[in-house]
Amino acid sequence: YGGFMTSEKSQTPLVTLFKNAIIKNAHKKGQ
C-alpha cells in the first residue's frame, strides 16, 4: 500500500502537466 501511495504522488504532477498542456493546446486552437 505504501508503494501505491508513493507512485500516486509522483503521478499527480504528470497528470497536472498533461492537463495544462491540453488546456494550452485548446487555447491555441481557439485563437
UniProtKB/Swiss-Prot annotation:
Belongs to the POMC family. One of its GO terms (cellular component) is secretory granule. GO terms for biological process: neuropeptide signaling pathway; regulation of corticosterone secretion. The keyword Flavoprotein does not apply. Keywords: Endorphin, Secreted. It comes from Camelus dromedarius. It comes from the Eukaryota. One of its GO terms (molecular function) is G protein-coupled receptor binding. This is Beta-endorphin. InterPro entries: Opioid_neuropept, POMC-derived_peptides. It is found in: Secreted.
